[in-house]
A protein has these predicted regions:
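Bacterial Sec signal peptide processing site at the extreme N-terminus
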Residues: 2-24, 33-36
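"A position-specific structural signal for the A-helix of alpha-solenoid helical repeats
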Residues: 11, 49-50, 86-93
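Conserved small-residue packing positions in alpha-helical repeats and bundles
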Residues: 13-16, 45, 52
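Alpha-helical junction/boundary sensor with strong preference for TPR arrays
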Residues: 35-36, 74-75, 82
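Alpha-helical linker/edge segments of TPR/alpha-solenoid repeat scaffolds
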Residues: 53-65, 89-101
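TPR/TPR-like (Sel1-like) alpha-helical repeat modules
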Residues: 59-79
Length: 101
């Protein structure tokens, strides 16, 4: 299970994403990568979702595709890890990115 600091960092990154502060999200997630091995399955899904959607918003399609594919895999392993709205956006974005390749 992730430590409280990792959970706090993930919540902070989520709040920054909601505020469209994408560069700040990337900074938080870069720090959170140090705790990556300790993240739980649902936290991994959220981590990769935020990483992928942030990369997408910052016009980094290769990184977005990679991270969203990892998020989709994590969400299949932990079905309740992402909200239905997040899953719908994840799969729409994956399709869009794949179509542009």
């Amino acid at each position: 299970m992730a430590c409280a600091g990792s959970q706090r960092d993930l919540r902070a990154a989520t709040a920054l994403y909601a505020d469209a502060r994408y560069e700040a999200v990337q900074a938080w997630l870069a720090q959170l990568r140090n705790d990556y091995p300790d993240l739980s399955g649902p936290e991994l899904a959220q981590f990769h979702y935020l990483s992928g959607m942030t990369a997408y918003r910052l016009s980094q399609p290769d990184e977005a595709l990679h991270e969203l594919a990892l998020a989709a895999h994590a969400a299949r392993e932990q079905p309740s890890a992402l909200a239905s709205e997040q899953l719908a956006l994840l799969y729409r974005t994956l399709e869009e990115l794949a179509d542009k390749r």
